[in-house]
Amino acid sequence: MVQHVSFKEAQLKNARVKSAYQEKEAVVKEYFRENKLDYGGFQVFLRAFKKEQNLEVWIKEKGKEEFTLLHTYAFCSTSGTLGPKRKEGDLQIPEGIYHINHFNPVSNFYLSLGVNYPNASDNILSDKQHPGGSIYIHGNCVTIGCIPITDDKIKELYVLAVEAKNNGQENIPIHIFPDRLDMGVPEKLAQDYAVDEKVSSCWKNLQAIYLDFKANKKLKPVSVNAKGEYQFKQ
């Protein structure tokens, strides 16, 4: 009889993941206690804001509909400027609606979580031949388009992500925004950063998703239309 090995058990066979749990699971559980959240059966949602260089971790408890902010991690460093990633080597951190598609327990940057760039929107709007890729949230403090949060903090985030996936969450969503896209912000950013209409329209498109989550603390399913724009699924 073949014994089933859970995702968490498989991950814990890696020394760095085992170390992360030993060092950081108690810290992560304390975040839950401080926010009066249940550690069992939760789901995770990530939001990154490039201008302020912050990565938010939101939690949805089992049986609940709404997400609650658990913790915020600071980027350790950044690259590029505000605006989406459009080609290999542009140093840009992507902007858009993504999910974690890879857990790397033996990363060159300690531990890392892969972001599914290029996604369906990027496949339409980015360079067709060389859109770039290999975008990760990772340890260390160096980047050419990724989000580094230090070895110390990636341990915490990796534990959270492993727990969520082990709880049955197939895709951990991550929304990456240039800034907090409140009313008037896309227009002000477009002026301050002297971007072209393609970039400003991208920001206005993302604003609808940002504002909906801000108002409801729920994630609506999103699809991509033929123009590469995000839209709520009907």
Model-found features: residue ranges?
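A conserved hydrophobic position in a structured secondary element of the catalytic/binding core
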Residues: 149
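Hydrophobic transmembrane alpha-helices
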Residues: 176-178
